[in-house]
């Protein structure tokens, strides 16, 4: 993996983690008062916050792995490939869970029809990822 690509992956993951934190804050600001008043499903609200936490920290871990992979001359190519593969997996987990959050929010505020469409699209995305991610992830160093 080239240094430029590793640096790009660091920036991409960092930006998505920051976006995830902003979405988390937005949800707390607008949905927490409804949660306190009992106007939304507490299980769904908390599940959404957990999903955003998993997404955020997965993206942060991806950023750290990509950053370590970008350190030229300090690590071997085998270790760089391993760090990049781990970063790819953390990034995919964070991105996938972050895409689940909108449907959870929509279910939380009782917009069931719209939430169902979002969930169906997320499931299509999940099937697409299961099928194609193994083909596009960073290859092992020995290959």
List where the protein language model places each region.
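Membrane-helix interface motif
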Residues: 24-36, 65-68
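Cytosolic juxtamembrane helix and N-cap/initiation of the first transmembrane helix
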Residues: 1-16, 43-46
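Alpha-helical transmembrane segments of integral membrane proteins
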Residues: 39-143
